[in-house]
Amino acid sequence: PWNGPIGGVWLGYVDGEYVINPTVAQREKSEMLVTVAGTKQKIVMIEAAANEVKEDVMLEGLKFAHKTIIELCDFIEGIKAEIGKEKFTYEAHTVNQELWDDIKAIAYEKIQYALDTDDKNIRDERMGVVTDELIEKLEEKYPTIQEEIGEILYKTQKEIVRAWLYQGRRVDGRGLNEIRPLSAEVDLLPRVHGCGLFTRGQTQVLTVATLAPLAEMQRLDGIDQEESKRYMHHYNFPSYSVGETKPSRGPGRREIGHGALAERSLVPVLPSEEEFPYAIRTVSEVLSSNGSTSQGSVCGSTLALMAAGVPIKRPVAGISCGLITTDEGFTTMVDIQGLEDFYGEMDFKVAGTKIGITSIQVDIKNDGLPYEVIEEALRKTRDARCYIIDEVLLKAIPEVRDHLS
């Protein structure tokens, strides 16, 4: 029982023309390579690498790809009509409504107060106090409250945060288009080729750049041929960045995915091997996390590369956009923090220069995005990344160093 079907295609842009599922030769000449998935009505996933592509080119490309997605969905529905089976009936889990009503009566305003801060540690402490108080007051009436209270508090917090966001209010007091306090520094570590520290609210990322001979490029054994990668970006998310003490077991899917996103964000602005005959490795260490660490890694990588003397064409910055929808309409907000990502419906991450987009990654929790949401997200993230480049990155290091460290 699901809301499919879903179709997916690759989208290229070669010589000013959109290409569906480009060949290997076409991909080498393409200005962008986008993986797009969607239903017949909406887009559900976007993963893009682009060569400073304009927002309107990206948007029209998604619309072009959607035509083929609709054809694929029709094809799948034809198969379903011919051989498909009847869907299983599914009874959704429901919470204890009586307990939920009692929790709201006792603690709704206290939960609102707990959420109303820009410090996630204070928020967690306040919610811990509320939880203990509720268990103490209601445990006799509801013996199973310890098993049920987590889900009910989650639903209550989600209800409050979403209502606030739709009204234009954020838990940290920002406006919907306002970015958290920003800072950037270079040269914190004296014995590396280049490093940059980028801070956005309670999210902080330290990126270190290292240069080596081209012989040290990463070798990749592909299915059909051996390839090499000259620029490598590795993303580390240690447990201490979120106040935990878990041991490190090596990179997981999250670290691999965020590292790949930050890596392809910088590739379009790197100099050619002839201009700069070095292998380049950047490593981003997340020191503190409250949302958008992957985009913080993009900004940190720009700082580190410029400090190392790598002659990148232009600075690259990244920012995310969130979404809340109701029966009345939708609201988007830039630079979502962890709570807004958790309770919202979209994490629309876009990186690029002031000229155009270099990468996109979109995660959603609803049934898909209409084009008016995508268009607004592209516009808002463009304005935000231009602000970050001008007001933060270029003030920390106005231009690429003219010498290597």
Which residues make up each language-model segment?
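Glycine-rich, flexible beta-strand/loop modules in the N-terminal catalytic cores of phosphate-handling
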Residues: 40, 47, 188, 193-278, ...
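Conserved helix-loop functional segments at active or binding sites
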Residues: 188, 213, 238-243, 263-276, ...
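A short glycine/serine-rich beta->alpha loop
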Residues: 246-252, 284-292
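Glycine-rich and small/hydrophobic secondary-structure elements
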Residues: 1, 253-260, 264, 292, ...
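Generic, well-ordered alpha-helical scaffold segments in large soluble proteins
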Residues: 64, 68, 72-75, 79, ...
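Mobile "lid/hinge" segments at catalytic clefts and subdomain interfaces of large enzymes
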Residues: 2-117, 305-402
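Extended amphipathic alpha-helical scaffolds
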Residues: 3, 87-225, 404-405
